[in-house]
Regions:
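Bulky hydrophobic segments
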Residues: 1-108, 114-132
Length: 132
Protein backbone atom coordinates (compact mmCIF):
# COMPACT_ATOMS: atom_id res chain seq x y z
CA UNK A 1 0.00 0.00 0.00
CA UNK A 2 2.83 2.36 0.88
CA UNK A 3 4.44 1.71 -2.53
CA UNK A 4 1.21 2.55 -4.36
CA UNK A 5 0.86 5.82 -2.45
CA UNK A 6 4.50 6.74 -3.14
CA UNK A 7 4.10 5.93 -6.83
CA UNK A 8 0.89 8.00 -7.00
CA UNK A 9 2.62 11.01 -5.42
CA UNK A 10 5.58 10.57 -7.79
CA UNK A 11 3.28 10.56 -10.83
CA UNK A 12 1.32 13.57 -9.53
CA UNK A 13 4.56 15.54 -9.10
CA UNK A 14 5.89 14.55 -12.51
CA UNK A 15 2.62 15.06 -14.43
CA UNK A 16 0.52 17.51 -12.37
CA UNK A 17 -1.62 18.89 -15.21
CA UNK A 18 -2.42 15.40 -16.49
CA UNK A 19 -3.55 14.30 -13.04
CA UNK A 20 -5.69 17.44 -12.67
CA UNK A 21 -7.33 16.81 -16.05
CA UNK A 22 -8.06 13.17 -15.18
CA UNK A 23 -9.61 14.17 -11.85
CA UNK A 24 -11.66 16.84 -13.65
CA UNK A 25 -12.94 14.26 -16.17
CA UNK A 26 -14.12 12.03 -13.30
CA UNK A 27 -15.84 14.94 -11.55
CA UNK A 28 -17.54 16.21 -14.71
CA UNK A 29 -18.61 12.68 -15.64
CA UNK A 30 -20.66 12.31 -12.47
CA UNK A 31 -21.83 15.87 -11.86
CA UNK A 32 -25.62 16.15 -12.35
CA UNK A 33 -25.75 18.92 -14.97
CA UNK A 34 -29.16 20.46 -15.69
CA UNK A 35 -30.49 20.25 -19.24
CA UNK A 36 -29.38 23.21 -21.35
CA UNK A 37 -32.12 24.12 -23.80
CA UNK A 38 -29.94 26.73 -25.50
CA UNK A 39 -27.56 23.99 -26.70
CA UNK A 40 -30.23 21.65 -28.06
CA UNK A 41 -29.89 23.21 -31.53
CA UNK A 42 -26.21 22.23 -31.79
CA UNK A 43 -25.99 18.83 -33.52
CA UNK A 44 -24.17 16.22 -31.41
CA UNK A 45 -23.12 18.80 -28.80
CA UNK A 46 -22.74 16.02 -26.24
CA UNK A 47 -20.42 14.01 -28.48
CA UNK A 48 -18.32 17.07 -29.36
CA UNK A 49 -17.96 17.70 -25.63
CA UNK A 50 -16.73 14.14 -25.08
CA UNK A 51 -14.22 14.43 -27.93
CA UNK A 52 -12.91 17.73 -26.55
CA UNK A 53 -12.75 16.49 -22.96
CA UNK A 54 -10.83 13.30 -23.73
CA UNK A 55 -8.79 14.81 -26.55
CA UNK A 56 -7.80 17.69 -24.29
CA UNK A 57 -6.92 15.44 -21.38
CA UNK A 58 -4.82 13.11 -23.51
CA UNK A 59 -3.27 16.09 -25.28
CA UNK A 60 -2.09 17.32 -21.88
CA UNK A 61 -0.74 13.83 -21.08
CA UNK A 62 1.22 13.80 -24.36
CA UNK A 63 2.50 17.35 -23.87
CA UNK A 64 3.78 16.64 -20.36
CA UNK A 65 5.33 13.35 -21.46
CA UNK A 66 7.08 14.79 -24.52
CA UNK A 67 8.44 17.77 -22.56
CA UNK A 68 10.01 15.44 -19.97
CA UNK A 69 11.47 12.75 -22.25
CA UNK A 70 13.98 12.82 -25.08
CA UNK A 71 12.81 9.49 -26.46
CA UNK A 72 9.31 8.11 -26.89
CA UNK A 73 8.58 4.83 -25.14
CA UNK A 74 5.95 3.42 -27.48
CA UNK A 75 4.75 0.75 -25.05
CA UNK A 76 4.25 3.19 -22.18
CA UNK A 77 2.54 5.71 -24.42
CA UNK A 78 0.26 3.08 -25.93
CA UNK A 79 -0.77 1.99 -22.44
CA UNK A 80 -0.92 5.31 -20.54
CA UNK A 81 -1.91 7.73 -23.30
CA UNK A 82 -4.24 5.58 -25.41
CA UNK A 83 -5.45 2.33 -23.84
CA UNK A 84 -5.81 3.47 -20.21
CA UNK A 85 -7.93 6.57 -21.07
CA UNK A 86 -10.22 4.38 -23.20
CA UNK A 87 -10.52 1.85 -20.36
CA UNK A 88 -11.20 4.72 -17.95
CA UNK A 89 -13.90 5.98 -20.31
CA UNK A 90 -15.46 2.51 -20.46
CA UNK A 91 -15.46 2.29 -16.67
CA UNK A 92 -17.07 5.71 -16.34
CA UNK A 93 -19.78 4.85 -18.88
CA UNK A 94 -20.59 1.61 -17.02
CA UNK A 95 -20.67 3.40 -13.66
CA UNK A 96 -22.95 6.09 -15.10
CA UNK A 97 -25.33 3.45 -16.43
CA UNK A 98 -25.47 1.14 -13.43
CA UNK A 99 -24.57 3.28 -10.42
CA UNK A 100 -26.37 6.59 -10.99
CA UNK A 101 -29.95 7.59 -11.55
CA UNK A 102 -29.16 10.91 -13.21
CA UNK A 103 -26.59 9.86 -15.85
CA UNK A 104 -26.69 7.21 -18.55
CA UNK A 105 -23.88 5.26 -20.18
CA UNK A 106 -23.87 5.32 -23.97
CA UNK A 107 -21.85 3.42 -26.57
CA UNK A 108 -21.63 6.56 -28.69
CA UNK A 109 -20.12 8.45 -25.74
CA UNK A 110 -17.44 5.76 -25.54
CA UNK A 111 -16.86 6.10 -29.30
CA UNK A 112 -16.57 9.89 -28.97
CA UNK A 113 -14.16 9.52 -26.05
CA UNK A 114 -12.04 7.06 -28.03
CA UNK A 115 -12.03 9.45 -30.98
CA UNK A 116 -10.76 12.25 -28.75
CA UNK A 117 -8.03 10.01 -27.35
CA UNK A 118 -6.96 8.95 -30.84
CA UNK A 119 -6.86 12.56 -32.06
CA UNK A 120 -4.59 13.33 -29.09
CA UNK A 121 -2.24 10.52 -30.18
CA UNK A 122 -1.86 12.17 -33.58
CA UNK A 123 -1.27 15.52 -31.85
CA UNK A 124 1.29 13.95 -29.50
CA UNK A 125 3.25 12.31 -32.30
CA UNK A 126 3.29 15.56 -34.28
CA UNK A 127 4.31 17.51 -31.16
CA UNK A 128 7.20 15.10 -30.57
CA UNK A 129 8.27 15.14 -34.22
CA UNK A 130 8.34 18.95 -34.46
CA UNK A 131 9.93 19.36 -31.02
CA UNK A 132 13.25 18.07 -32.35
Amino acid sequence: MKYILQKTVQIAKKYPFSVCCIVLVWILSFYPFPEMESLEDVPFVDKWTHIAMYGGTCGVIWTEYVRRHLKLDGGKLFFYAWLLPILMSSTIELLQEYCTTYRSGEWFDLAANSTGVTIAVVYGLLFFYFKK
